[in-house]
Amino acid sequence: MVAAKKTKKSHEGINSRLALVMKSGKYTLGYKSVLKSLRSSKGKLILISSNCPPLRRSEIEYYAMLAKVGVHHYNRNNVDLGTACGKYFRVSCLSIVDPGDSDIIKSLPGDQ
């Protein structure tokens, strides 16, 4: 029960930081634009939902490894990631280009 509470707390922290990025920062949503941001070395952090297809996930992780960018696996599905972004559609992956006022890049355990 304590572990469930801790994960809920951490989701709230990630969601609030993500909302701040959506307000004050720059980001790209979607698979193709995430790959573009990785190839052009603009992305600082990548978030991938839990139900992102394995082939897409591995391709994003490969490009992120080449670009030396951190990848965070969001523990919820793409509907919840879209809701956390304040969107009314599903988001399987997103790239944070400029975090703005948020400290999400320092706070999330990415592979940096």
Swiss-Prot record:
Domain of life assignment: Eukaryota
Record-linked PROSITE patterns: RIBOSOMAL_L30E_1, RIBOSOMAL_L30E_2
Residue stretches spanning the membrane: none
Listed GO MF terms: mRNA binding; structural constituent of ribosome
Gene Ontology CC terms, in alphabetical order: cytosolic large ribosomal subunit; nucleus
Record keywords, A-Z: Ribonucleoprotein, Ribosomal protein
InterPro entries: Ribosomal_eL30-like, Ribosomal_eL30-like_sf, Ribosomal_eL30_CS, Ribosomal_eL8/eL30/eS12/Gad45
Pfam families (alphabetical): Ribosomal_L7Ae
Disulphides: none
Homology family: Belongs to the eukaryotic ribosomal protein eL30 family.
NCBIfam families for this protein: PRK01018.1
Protein name, UniProt field: Large ribosomal subunit protein eL30z
Gene source species: Arabidopsis thaliana (Mouse-ear cress)
Gene: RPL30A
